[in-house]
């Protein structure tokens, strides 16, 4: 028997056997252990979940704003009470260090839910006067049943980022976690029910994106799809959503983000920021600043500071609280990252440190790749152009502000960007010219609940978090009222 046993679907407020009974394994990437068997949903299960959501959503939407707010706040309390339990599951499922999952993943997800729970009573329409005898008022009404499709790198956090605004606005959600990391989304479903969420308002269907994800995006009973993943999959989701019932979509599709260090920067601070922007969570963060631009005159000094810091990284068993760098999420992904590293070597980038998988001792059975830094990189290299989603930093030199802005924007992506400088005039001037949806000055990576998150260009459509996201889970109804007589031309 695996550590977490058989995991069922969550439909209509209860853990439910799938129709087919087919299963797939959840694997701990730190050691290859099968930690759970998960049931795979099929078309009948999708229909059941949609039917349950359609029943539960009107019940949820009919509650007062304060009633809905209290239920979501209770879910926040449960999440925080069970932080360590959920963090341990997340670590086993993703390979992320326990030091991360305990302090970030569940904590920040709960913060987002608390934020939207507090906004529910403030979700209101407008009154628009037309003339003395007439006015218009608007209502913000729920979309109905919406779908969320998650990525594997922040399973619980993404489930909360998607469900919190959807539920706050009075919708029901069917959530499909990544088949690679599904366990904590199933736990979240039980937590919502324990907090008082009506049956059917939050459902979880596990299975592959090609099957379950596609069925959700094409289902006529779904009003909106929020997707996090790669560009190719996102385009397919968007096309299916538009081709079925013209669904609304939110897309977060990754990036190849520039981090620009200017000559006046504190080089130690710049190196610390670059380390967090590349190696946190073993480099598996969509906003990572993997293209690090450094003035040519400072390149050698900066490289030295980076190498010193990489050597201090504590690589190990993610369940050991001393570990701050764990395995990649799967053996398949490890192989993908290694192919990119091999490409960097072939194309002539200079390997400063790393560049290999870790296959000895206690790490021998895990999906580990050493923190890797390339320098003397060119803009046309594969490691500079494509999202690797692993612990691979590319250092590029530049000589002028105009040059680095042009090169930073020379990408199909536009998710994030950052600058490190003591000159705030320059910081704002440059940031305003960078084509990215999330920008940082003298910091990197924090995404507060109040901060809209999303990309330009191929990095996405729409935003997550912030007030505007709550509004995008509603539709506006306009009502005109006439208080005097009505005159017909007929």
Curated annotation (Swiss-Prot):
- Entry-linked Pfam families: Aldedh (PF00171)
Family membership: Belongs to the aldehyde dehydrogenase family.
Co-factor: note? Binds 2 potassium ions per subunit.
What this protein is called in its record is Betaine aldehyde dehydrogenase
Summarize the subunit comment: Dimer of dimers.
Catalytic residues, per the record, are 162, 252, 286, 464
Species per Swiss-Prot/TrEMBL record: Yersinia pseudotuberculosis serotype I (strain IP32953)
- Gene behind this chain? betB
User: Which parts of the sequence bind NAD(+)?
Assistant: 150-152, 176-179, 230-233, 254, 286, 387
Job of this protein? Involved in the biosynthesis of the osmoprotectant glycine betaine. Catalyzes the irreversible oxidation of betaine aldehyde to the corresponding acid.
Catalytic activity from the UniProt record:
betaine aldehyde + NAD(+) + H2O = glycine betaine + NADH + 2 H(+)
Q: Which cofactor does it need?
A: K(+)
GO biological process terms held by the UniProt record: glycine betaine biosynthetic process from choline
Q: In which pathway does it act?
A: Amine and polyamine biosynthesis; betaine biosynthesis via choline pathway; betaine from betaine aldehyde: step 1/1
């Amino acid at each position: 028997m695996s550590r977490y046993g058989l995991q069922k679907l969550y439909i209509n407020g209860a853990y439910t056997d799938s129709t087919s009974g087919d299963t797939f394994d959840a694997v701990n990437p730190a050691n290859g252990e099968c930690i759970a068997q998960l049931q795979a949903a099929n078309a009948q299960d999708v229909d059941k979940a949609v039917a349950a959501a359609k029943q539960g959503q009107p019940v949820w939407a009919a509650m007062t704003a304060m009633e809905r707010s209290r239920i979501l706040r209770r879910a926040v309390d449960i999440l925080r009470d069970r932080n360590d339990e959920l963090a341990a599951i997340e670590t086993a499922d993703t390979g992320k260090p326990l030091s991360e999952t305990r302090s970030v993943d569940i904590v920040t997800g709960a913060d987002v839910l608390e934020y939207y729970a507090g906004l529910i009573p403030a979700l209101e329409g407008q009154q628009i006067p037309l003339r003395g005898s007439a006015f218009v008022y608007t209502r913000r009404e729920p979309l109905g049943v919406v779908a969320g499709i998650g990525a594997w790198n922040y399973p619980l956090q993404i489930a909360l980022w998607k469900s919190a605004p959807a539920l706050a606005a009075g919708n029901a959600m069917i959530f499909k976690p990544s088949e690679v990391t599904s366990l904590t989304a199933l736990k979240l479903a039980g937590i919502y029910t324990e907090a008082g969420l009506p049956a059917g308002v939050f459902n979880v269907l596990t299975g592959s994106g090609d099957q379950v994800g596609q069925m959700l995006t094409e289902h006529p009973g779904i009003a909106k799809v929020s997707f996090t993943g790669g560009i190719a999959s996102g385009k397919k989701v968007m096309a299916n959503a538009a081709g079925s019932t013209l669904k609304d979509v939110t897309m977060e599709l990754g990036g190849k983000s520039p981090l620009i260090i200017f000559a006046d920067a504190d080089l130690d601070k710049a190196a610390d920021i670059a380390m967090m922007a590349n190696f946190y969570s073993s480099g598996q963060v969509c906003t990572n600043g993997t293209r690090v631009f450094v003035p040519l005159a400072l390149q050698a000094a900066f490289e030295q500071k980076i190498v010193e810091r990489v050597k201090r990284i504590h690589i190990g068993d993610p369940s050991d609280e001393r570990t701050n760098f764990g395995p990649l999420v799967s053996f398949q992904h490890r192989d993908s990252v290694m192919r990119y590293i091999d490409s960097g070597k072939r194309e002539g980038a200079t390997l400063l440190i790393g560049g290999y998988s870790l296959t000895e001792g206690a790490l021998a059975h895990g999906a580990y790749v050493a923190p890797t830094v390339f320098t003397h990189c060119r803009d046309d290299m594969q490691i500079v152009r494509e999202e690797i989603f692993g612990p691979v930093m590319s250092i590029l030199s530049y000589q002028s502000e105009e040059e680095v802005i042009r090169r930073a924007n020379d990408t199909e992506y536009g998710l994030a960007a950052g600058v490190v400088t003591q000159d705030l005039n320059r910081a704002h001037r440059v940031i305003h010219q960078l084509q990215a949806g999330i920008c940082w000055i003298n910091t990197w990576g924090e995404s507060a609940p109040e901060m809209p998150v999303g990309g330009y260009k191929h990095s996405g459509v729409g935003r997550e978090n912030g007030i505007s996201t709550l509004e995008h889970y509603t539709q506006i109804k306009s009502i005109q009222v006439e208080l005097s007589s009505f005159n017909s031309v007929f």
